[in-house]
């Protein structure tokens, strides 16, 4: 008997934080165009955002259904802890707390799909662990395939890299590997409390053998781990798992392009009669403009360049900065789609949002980076390692630091040349096609296995 070639139902599962939901929304819209039926599982606050794109919505249960629009409210201890291991430990603990509700939510959608006689492939983002218990042996409905889409730097332990969060470059020399092994073991020792919490939680769900690290298991557990970057942006690992694939960056579909009109001064951007520098602090760490936006505007005010700053959460500088005098060479907007803005940029100054860095390099634009919250320490370290960026390696930059780095990048062609090399590598990838191909491969393999069992 020949295995069925019908397309599987695709369940998209995202933690309810914008950058996570937005990426899977792009994927979901593309899959619907390709003829897949989809269900989108995330927090209630994103129902309208998901349904506006024409995607069927299913709400997460219990504490997994939080309001990720306010990160500080969702994770109240985050801002009270210093960047680095304390914050990562707190975040790990919070993610583990949500796993039972995530697991229950995924099982509910799988039950709904199975009741219709359909097979499902589950796609989840890096921070969502709802399908992992099943992959680890917990009882319940097993999907035809599982895919995790990597939207952060890879959190893998490796003999060739220092532990995630250290910000150190890779080193595969004998001395470097000795450093890496020692540092990795130290981090595992520090994470013993959260690891014990992870182990207890997984066993409560019926998992018999629990992996020895939560973040590592995020990569190694699914059938496929599809990393949203090019291979040249991620550290090389001689011991990388076989399920890992690099698929390039996502291009936004029509449904995902911003509805914000372009500003009245957009002609000045298109005119491009002088170097254009873009500065932004992204969608999460954008509550203190003194971290990067203000130092950048101060640093560049006397240079013969044009600066565009996007504030994301407001239309103008507010709070204790509302009296700040905007320099004459600065144009301010709440939001401009980076896919449009970066076409005209010569340099991007940013705090290191993973998607923003991918978009900049995908357009061949070099960067100056400063940020140490969330995963930004690792993102910025990789960007500098790639050769297309300068990493200031701080949370709050000074005007002098920014000016020196901006002038260096604009005056030294090696940064632009390297960014253009990365652009070519991004252009050779088709992330959405790769995702569809992996869905089909997993569904076909599952169907063939089922046929063999029935013979």
Curated annotation (Swiss-Prot):
Alphabetically ordered keywords of this record: Glycosyltransferase, Transferase
Family annotation (InterPro entries): EryCIII-like_C, Glycosyltransferase_28, UDP_glucos_trans
This protein's record includes keyword Transferase: yes
EC number: 2.4.1.-
Catalysed reaction equations from the record: exophillate + UDP-alpha-D-galactose = phaeomoniecin D + UDP + H(+)
Lineage per the UniProt record: Eukaryota, Fungi, Dikarya, Ascomycota, Pezizomycotina
Entry's family note: Belongs to the UDP-glycosyltransferase family.
GO MF term list: hexosyltransferase activity; UDP-glycosyltransferase activity
Protein name: UDP-glycosyltransferase 2
Function: Catalyzes the second glycosylation step during phaeomoniecin D biosynthesis, the further O-galactosylation of exophillic acid (produced by the O-glycosyltransferase OGT1) to yield the 4-O-beta-D-galactoside phaeomoniecin D.
Pathway: Secondary metabolite biosynthesis
Applied biotechnology: Phaeomoniecin D was found to show anti-HIV activity, antibacterial activity against methicillin-resistant Staphylococcus aureus (MRSA), alpha-glucosidase inhibitory activity, as well as significant protein tyrosine phosphatase 1B (PTP1B) inhibitory activity and thus is a promising candidate for drug discovery projects.
């Amino acid at each position: 008997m020949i295995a069925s070639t019908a397309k599987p139902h695709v369940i998209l599962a995202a933690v309810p934080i914008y950058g996570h939901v937005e990426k899977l929304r792009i994927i979901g819209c593309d899959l619907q165009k390709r003829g897949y039926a989809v269900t989108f599982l995330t927090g209630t606050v994103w129902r309208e955002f998901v349904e506006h794109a024409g995607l069927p919505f299913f709400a997460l249960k219990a504490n997994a259904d939080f309001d990720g629009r306010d990160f500080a409210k969702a994770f109240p201890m985050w801002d009270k802890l210093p960047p680095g291991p304390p914050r990562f430990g707190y975040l790990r603990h919070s993610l583990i707390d949500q796993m039972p509700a995530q697991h229950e939510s995924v099982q509910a959608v799988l039950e709904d799909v199975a009741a219709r006689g359909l097979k499902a492939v589950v796609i989840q983002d890096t921070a969502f662990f709802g399908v992992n218990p099943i992959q680890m042996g917990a009882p319940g409905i097993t999907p035809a395939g599982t895919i995790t889409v990597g939207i952060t730097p890879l959190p893998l332990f490796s003999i060739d890299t220092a532990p995630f969060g250290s910000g150190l470059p890779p080193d595969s020399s004998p001395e470097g590997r000795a450093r890496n092994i020692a540092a990795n073991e130290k981090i595992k020792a520090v994470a013993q409390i959260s690891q014990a919490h992870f182990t207890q939680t997984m066993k409560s769900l019926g998992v018999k053998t629990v992996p020895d690290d939560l973040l590592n298991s995020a990569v190694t557990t699914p059938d496929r781990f599809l990393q949203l970057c090019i291979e040249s942006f991620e550290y090389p690992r001689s011991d990388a798992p076989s399920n890992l694939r690099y698929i390039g960056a996502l291009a936004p579909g029509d449904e995902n392009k911003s509805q914000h009109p372009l500003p009245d001064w957009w002609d000045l951007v298109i005119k491009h009669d002088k170097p254009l520098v873009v500065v932004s602090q992204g969608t999460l760490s954008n509550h203190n403009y003194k971290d990067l936006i203000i130092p950048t505007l101060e640093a560049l005010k006397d240079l013969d360049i044009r600066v565009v700053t996007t504030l994301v959460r407001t239309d103008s500088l507010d709070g204790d900065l509302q009296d700040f005098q905007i320099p004459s060479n600065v144009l301010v907007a709440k939001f401009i789609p980076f896919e449009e803005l970066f076409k005209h940029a010569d340099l991007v100054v940013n705090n290191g949002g993973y998607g923003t860095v991918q978009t900049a390099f995908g357009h061949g634009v070099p960067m100056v980076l400063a940020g140490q919250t969330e995963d930004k320490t690792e993102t910025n370290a990789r960007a500098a390692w790639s050769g297309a960026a300068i990493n200031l390696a701080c949370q709050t930059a000074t005007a002098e630091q920014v000016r020196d780095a901006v002038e260096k990048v604009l005056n030294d062609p090696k940064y632009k040349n390297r960014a253009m090399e990365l652009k070519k590598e991004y252009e050779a990838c088709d992330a959405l096609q790769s995702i569809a191909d992996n869905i089909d491969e997993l569904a076909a393999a599952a169907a063939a296995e089922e046929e063999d069992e029935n013979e």
